[in-house]
Amino acid sequence: MSNKLTEICDTKRDHVARRKAETSFAELTARAKAADAPRGFRAALDRKVAEGGYGLIAEIKKASPSKGLIRPDFDPPAHARAYQAAGAACLSVLTDMPYFQGHDDYLVQARAACALPALRKDFIVDPWQVTEARALGADAILIIVAALDDGQMAEIEAAAIEHGMDALVEVHDADEFDRALRLRSRLIGVNNRDLRDFTIDFARTYELVGHAPAGCTFVAESGLGSKADLDAMADHGVGCFLVGESLMRQDDLAAATRRLLTGA
């Protein structure tokens, strides 16, 4: 695990401990059960691909630790509507506050503004957060293989399955990919960014996809900014993509998303 990822996860564990002290698990579970039914995150991606398009997970992201503020005029409901109008299959909403200036409310607001399934994009280090995500209305959660051991991953995935949610399992290399395949989820995100030096390398994704068993839905992440990038990935069997910063920096979010998906 990189030093930054270790720092973020340690901070997150402290945050979760405080949240647990504030809200009982029984109360949180009741809220999760009362939430709208999950919208089917992976199913929405697969449906777009089956229709001959690309399954885009369009990200709502205000800032990042490395880039600072990305979107000054930040408006999660408006961004969600723009993404939906332009043909995105799903949303990804950053909820981490200390490092990404996210907030739980952004997820609630974005999902309420559209009909798209939404991923809670956060650093999940405890199954408690999965129940919290469902209580917020999330349809999917992120499992970062680099941040967890096999037992932790299995517990978090089991919580997601219990709540009817999908788990996007993010990997960066072959070892993490092998560990991801021990889980039940076959929604695999391959991050093109090297955590050691933050360079982008599409070749790693091509190689991992080529060694995958049948039945996986692959999502390419990081460094994607044009339809040519998406087409290159598609030539290697990847039809789904998570794109955030390159879209969030555009003035006209809907037009930029359409251009990414269609080239026009």
Curated annotation (Swiss-Prot):
Catalytic activity of the protein: 1-(2-carboxyphenylamino)-1-deoxy-D-ribulose 5-phosphate + H(+) = (1S,2R)-1-C-(indol-3-yl)glycerol 3-phosphate + CO2 + H2O
Gene3D superfamilies from the UniProt entry: Aldolase class I
Pathway the protein acts in: Amino-acid biosynthesis; L-tryptophan biosynthesis; L-tryptophan from chorismate: step 4/5
Gene Ontology biological-process annotations: L-tryptophan biosynthetic process
GO MF term set: indole-3-glycerol-phosphate synthase activity; phosphoribosylanthranilate isomerase activity
Pfam families in alphabetical order: IGPS
Key word Transcription present: no
EC numbers for this chain: 4.1.1.48
Protein keywords: Amino-acid biosynthesis, Aromatic amino acid biosynthesis, Decarboxylase, Lyase, Tryptophan biosynthesis
Record SUPFAM superfamilies: Ribulose-phoshate binding barrel (SSF51366)
InterPro entries recorded: Aldolase_TIM (IPR013785), Indole-3-glycerol_P_synth (IPR045186), Indole-3-glycerol_P_synth_dom (IPR013798), Indole-3-GlycerolPSynthase_CS (IPR001468), RibuloseP-bd_barrel (IPR011060)
Keyword flag Lyase: yes
CDD domains: IGPS
HAMAP family: IGPS_B (MF_00134_B)
NCBIfam families, sorted: PRK00278.1-2, PRK00278.1-6, PRK00278.2-4
Protein family: Belongs to the TrpC family.
PANTHER family: INDOLE-3-GLYCEROL-PHOSPHATE SYNTHASE, TRYPTOPHAN BIOSYNTHESIS PROTEIN
Name assigned to this protein: Indole-3-glycerol phosphate synthase
Gene encoding the protein: trpC
